[in-house]
């Protein structure tokens, strides 16, 4: 009986589906015949059956009974709503002409709000701009698979991305000019960099789903800061929507790098590491021992594959108090695992020779775990003639990584043997940027406007217990093609006859940049007739930057210099006993504090007409840089200072011969200031080569 009832129910469902009727149709203007896109068609007797017309004005109604008469309700903005009775047994297609709903009004008040998120708005912004720029809208960003700003920038013409050693895009190169020749803004305000060496900002730490649009300026006007020969990247973050809006996104995936050829994902025990150097924890007179250094970074393990990647974001916003007050809060998280490999060759010049030669071959494997989070919140208050905006942003990234390198010195390769160094580097680097700013715009008269901004921002980088350890191997080979000397590090033909620990280093470095800045601009419009106007603008800015940089390094030798390891596996790094060769840390010129004061003032005028636009301006900037090294060094001054003025003219011409064409010509003068890392007289062995600062370095 039970089977019979189930079969009967299924048969009834199938019969109903077969008997369902489909009605096609089109909706057009009864005078012009133009298709009316988005017309709503509902069935009065069946409220659940509804549809809208497509781009060609056609529609299809599904799930109608096979017999009977029904009333269609057809509605479209500015047209009269119609009710049409249709006998579905006699009609398969229906053409519906719509009549305009004309009414005579005594007064019409039109209010508008520009939607900056759309592609159309981006095109209009580029078209109307007085200087050369590109804009990517939020609509394009949402449709793309890009998860951070660096990936989005790759889609802009004239922009290429510089990738870090692990292969990820990080810095923008605008118009072919190096990353140091551009700067980054958030909502039109410059922010500091967490980088320990330079002013430029790694753009891969900013989640793309927090952005409203991305603006890339390829020429400067006088009201823009002058240290950008290449251009400016402005990240305009999400604004409060015109009505309640809740958006969320989530994605999961995995890197196929670790699935190919059986590659392993490498990790170290970063939960057990030394948070502070002994120098900072116990003072400059403290003699460090091995008990002060935890062994977690040395405990390297391999896994067949990492956990899946996860990316998610959410934003919520609304307007209150008769749309005067807007609020939006958004957050993002990106938890990703990635890997890559690359070859790096060191070069030298032989004594008395003019040619370089490769002195060392290295094949490097990277396993990286990135955790990026971002939060932003914005409030805006709009009153007649006035607008206040308070914006807050915090982005944070933690990158844990293992770099495993096999290196071969070409100078000491024997006929059947050579030395191979296996180096392990374990890192856990944290970067963060916090910015808060208050902006005001005041239309005091119809033609006179004042806008101002006050900003506090801070960028930090912490890189504690960066660990390097090297094993040295004596390798024998049958010298056949395809062995390590020929380029294949993992050749099955080689035999490791001896492995012993060589040396180790542990570095502790961190830096902090703190900025206070203020801006003010005054704008006055003058009209000449009906088709020409002049926009006069003047203003100034002041920024105070404070930077602290700390760097401590400890060198280690194996406790047993005659120790020979059983093999060169990854686990061997955690079993070696070391002794500290530099228990008081190495004195470094990279322990310094610095200050920078930048003031600027400008004046410019923009002439607009139907033929185009001319912008002419002049900017003056004063720079004062001071650094103080915390330690004394022979033949070196402990304090250094630079102070100078720069005068920067600019001109932008836009000719509009037709409504669909702009011809642009730009001229501007800019500067490039050295970073503190470059003018402090330090000298260290960097990742790839020896680095040295130059206190006499001038701006360009």
What are these model-derived regions, one by one?
Residues 62, 150-190, 231-234:
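Extracytoplasmic beta-strand/coil segments of soluble accessory domains associated
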Residues 96, 193, 205-249:
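A beta-strand signature from Gram-negative outer-membrane beta-barrel systems
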Residues 47-58:
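Short, acidic Ser/Thr/Gly-rich low-complexity loop/linker segments typical of extracellular
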Residues 102, 240-245, 320-325, 384-385, ...:
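Short loop/turn motifs that connect adjacent beta-strands in outer-membrane beta-barrel proteins
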Residues 430-439, 443-447, 455-457, 509-521, ...:
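Structural signature of Gram-negative outer-membrane beta-barrels, strongest in the C-terminal barrel
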Residues 62, 161, 189-218, 264-268:
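Short acidic/polar hinge/loop motifs at secondary-structure boundaries
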Residues 28-32, 39-44, 73-79, 89-142, ...:
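Short, acidic, small-residue-rich periplasmic hinge/interaction motif at the N-terminus
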Residues 296-404, 431-436, 649-651:
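Transmembrane beta-barrel wall of Gram-negative outer-membrane proteins
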């Amino acid at each position: 009986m039970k089977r019979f009832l189930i079969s009967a129910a299924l048969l009834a469902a199938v019969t109903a589906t077969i008997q369902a009727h489909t009605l096609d149709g089109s909706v057009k203007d009864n005078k012009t015949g133009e298709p009316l896109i988005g017309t709503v068609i509902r069935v009065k007797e069946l409220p659940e059956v509804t549809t809208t017309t497509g781009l060609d004005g056609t529609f299809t109604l599904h799930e109608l009974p096979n017999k009977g008469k029904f009333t269609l309700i057809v509605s479209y903005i500015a047209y009269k709503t119609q009710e049409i009775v249709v006998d579905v047994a006699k009609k398969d297609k229906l053409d519906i002409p719509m009549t305009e709903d004309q009414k005579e009004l005594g007064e019409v008040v039109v209010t508008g709000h520009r939607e900056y998120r759309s592609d159309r708005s981006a095109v209009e912004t580029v078209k109307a701009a007085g200087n050369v720029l590109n804009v990517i809208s939020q609509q394009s960003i949402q449709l793309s698979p890009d998860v951070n700003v660096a990936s989005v920038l790759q889609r802009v013409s004239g922009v290429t991305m510089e990738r870090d050693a692990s292969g990820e895009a990080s810095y923008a190169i605008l118009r072919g000019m190096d990353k140091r020749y551009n700067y980054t803004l958030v909502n039109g305000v410059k922010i500091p960099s967490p980088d320990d060496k330079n002013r430029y900002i790694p753009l891969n730490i900013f989640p793309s789903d927090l952005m409203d649009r991305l603006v890339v300026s390829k020429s400067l006007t006088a009201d823009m800061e002058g240290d950008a020969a290449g251009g400016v990247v402005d990240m305009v973050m999400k604004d409060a929507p015109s009505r309640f809006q809740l958006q969320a996104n989530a994605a999961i995936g995995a890197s196929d790098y670790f699935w190919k050829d059986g590659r392993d994902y490498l990790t170290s025990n970063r939960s057990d590491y030394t948070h502070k150097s002994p120098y900072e924890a116990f003072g400059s007179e403290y003699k460090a021992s091995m008990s002060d250094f935890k062994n977690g970074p040395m405990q390297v393990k391999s896994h067949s594959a990492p956990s899946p990647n996860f990316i998610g974001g959410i934003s919520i916003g609304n307007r209150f108090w008769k749309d005067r007050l807007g609020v939006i809060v958004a957050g993002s998280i990106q938890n990703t695992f990635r890997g890559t490999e690359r070859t790096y060759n060191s070069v030298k010049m032989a004594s008395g020779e003019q040619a370089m030669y490769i002195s060392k071959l290295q094949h490097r494997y990277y396993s990286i775990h990135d955790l990026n989070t971002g939060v932003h919140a914005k409030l805006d208050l709009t009153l007649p003639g006035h607008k206040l905006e308070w914006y807050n942003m915090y982005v944070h990234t933690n990158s844990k990584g293992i770099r495993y390198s096999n290196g071969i010195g070409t100078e000491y390769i024997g006929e059947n043997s050579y030395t191979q160094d296996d180096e392990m580097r374990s890192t856990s680097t944290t970067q963060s940027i916090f910015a808060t700013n208050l902006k005001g715009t005041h239309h005091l008269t119809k033609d006179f406007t004042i806008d101002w901004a006050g900003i506090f921002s801070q960028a930090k980088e912490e890189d504690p217990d960066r660990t390097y350890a090297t094993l040295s191997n004596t390798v024998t080979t049958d010298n056949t093609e395809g062995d390590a000397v020929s380029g294949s590090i993992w050749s099955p033909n080689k035999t490791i006859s001896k492995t012993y620990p060589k040396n180790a280093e542990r570095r502790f470095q961190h830096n902090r940049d703190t900025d206070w800045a203020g801006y003010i601009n005054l704008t006055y419009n003058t009209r000449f007739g009906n088709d020409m106007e002049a926009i006069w603008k003047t203003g100034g800015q002041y920024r105070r930057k404070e930077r602290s940089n700390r760097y401590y390094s400890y060198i280690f030798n194996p406790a047993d210099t005659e120790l020979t390891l059983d093999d060169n596996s990854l686990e061997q790094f955690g079993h070696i006993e070391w002794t500290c060769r530099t228990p008081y840390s190495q004195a470094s010129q990279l322990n310094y504090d610095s200050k920078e004061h930048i003031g600027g003032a400008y004046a410019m005028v923009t002439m607009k007409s139907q033929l185009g636009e001319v912008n002419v301006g002049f900017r003056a900037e004063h720079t004062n840089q001071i650094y103080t090294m915390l330690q004394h060094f022979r033949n070196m001054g402990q304090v250094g200072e630079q102070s100078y003025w720069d005068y920067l003219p600019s001109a932008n011409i836009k000719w509009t011969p037709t409504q669909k064409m702009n011809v642009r010509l730009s001229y501007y003068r800019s500067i490039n200031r050295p970073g503190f890392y470059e003018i402090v007289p330090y000298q260290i062995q960097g990742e790839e080569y020896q680095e040295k600062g130059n206190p006499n370095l001038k701006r360009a």
